[in-house]
Amino acid sequence: MPTWTEYIFYKKLGKAPSPGDVVEVVPDLVGFHDLTGYHVLEVLEQMGKVEVFDRGRVVVAFDHLAPPPTQRAAELQVYIRRHVKALGLPHFYDVGGGILHQIILEKYAMPEQVIFAADSHTNTAGAVGAFAQGLGATDIAAALKLGKTWLVVPTPFAVRVVGEFPKGVMGKDVALHLLGAFGAEGFNGYSVEVTVEKPKAFPMDDRATVANMSTEMGADALVFIPDEVTVAYLHEARGVSYKPPALGGGKYADEYTVELGRLEPLVAAPHSVDNVKAVAEVEGIEVDQVFIGSCTNGRLSDIEVAAKILRHGRVKARCIAIPASYDVFRRAMELGYVDVLTKAGCVVTYGTCGPCLGGHFGVAGPGEVVLTTSNRNFKGRVGHPDSKVYLANPAVAAATALTGRITDPRQYL
């Protein structure tokens, strides 16, 4: 029997390719955002007539510099809007719609699909069992115009998740654990296939976080093999029925087991995603700003745990909270989470990447320390190159905002 990745490629190609093969694939979905869209469309213009192979398979979102903080950003968005209108693209999400990867996960991604987008965190859609990969602007332009593009078939690697999350531990800690175990390039050339022993103990939001940060692990893709949680998510979110195929017995290059019960809240310290430490090792470090959000940890359960902790008082560090999409924001408002966050002193806004890339809405200054739920912490990522960035789960982030120092959240849960 094939592995999940092999199964997807077999369906696409009509034959079973081997790892390392260069193949042409017809994507089920292609996406770009405001920061990469200009380059994608520029390449399309250079190829001749600006056209797409299938308007219904294209998703565009303004998320990185939205609302535009500079005149140049506004100019780029005007340019992209003009092309979106001319092409008649129906799946366009303007300012406030949310982050591209969250929108794809919420509304479009399906198991067994191949998804390409002009952003490195396209892997997020692997949470539902799609083979999702970020590509450069030239390759995305080719996929849009020709309806196909090339890739190198990755080597399957198995990760088995057993047990249940202890208090204060989330999907982010699984991602950081893997980074600590394998390093920032440990899965280069691999498609990581994750099976979950107790599916209901590992919700979709946490799966999305792990899939998202597989980029930092160097993985070509990370896919959660569909199970009952996948089926329930697709039905509840979109009213879509899905029955996973019966696979098993595939051959993997290697395998690794994550025991959830042995994990604790983790932190990636400056200036590398694989500089992973237990929260106790960095507890007490003063923090100037906390960011809760991004395509990594801006989903509803992330906002929920932050609100649960921030009910305990007002923040002592600047706190910015950004739900990853309009739908998440709206639901967080309905459930009272936004009210809790604002009363605690957090600044809350619609879905935007904002401070994650040091673009706007919370850029770090010289010498400042930032703790964020996003996915990267190299020098200058959140702003000034002399700032320091720590990565952690939303519970650690909320507890840190509450005390003004890096804090173990378990005392508040």
UniProtKB/Swiss-Prot annotation:
What does the cofactor section's free text say about binding?
A: Binds 1 [4Fe-4S] cluster per subunit.
Q: What is its EC number?
A: 4.2.1.33
Pfam families tied to this protein: Aconitase
Positions bound to [4Fe-4S] cluster? 295, 353, 356
Matching entries from Gene3D superfamilies are given as:
Aconitase, domain 3
- The transmembrane residues are none
Gene Ontology terms, MF aspect: 3-isopropylmalate dehydratase activity; 4 iron, 4 sulfur cluster binding; metal ion binding
* InterPro entries, A to Z: Acnase/IPM_dHydase_lsu_aba_1/3, Acoase/IPM_deHydtase_lsu_aba, Aconitase_4Fe-4S_BS, Aconitase_4Fe-4S_dom, HAcnase/IPMdehydase_lsu_prok, Homoacnase/IPMdehydase_lsu, IPM_dehydratase_rel_enz
Which NCBIfam families did the record assign?
A: hacA_fam, IPMI_arch, PRK00402.1
Please state which protein family the record places this protein in: Belongs to the aconitase/IPM isomerase family. LeuC type 2 subfamily.
HAMAP family for the chain: LeuC_type2 (MF_01027)
Assembly and interaction partners: Heterodimer of LeuC and LeuD.
Tell me the function of this protein. Catalyzes the isomerization between 2-isopropylmalate and 3-isopropylmalate, via the formation of 2-isopropylmaleate.
> What is the name attached to this protein's record?
3-isopropylmalate dehydratase large subunit
What is the protein's species of origin? Pyrobaculum calidifontis (strain DSM 21063 / JCM 11548 / VA1)
Organism lineage: Archaea, Thermoproteota, Thermoprotei, Thermoproteales, Thermoproteaceae
Q: What is the gene name? A: leuC
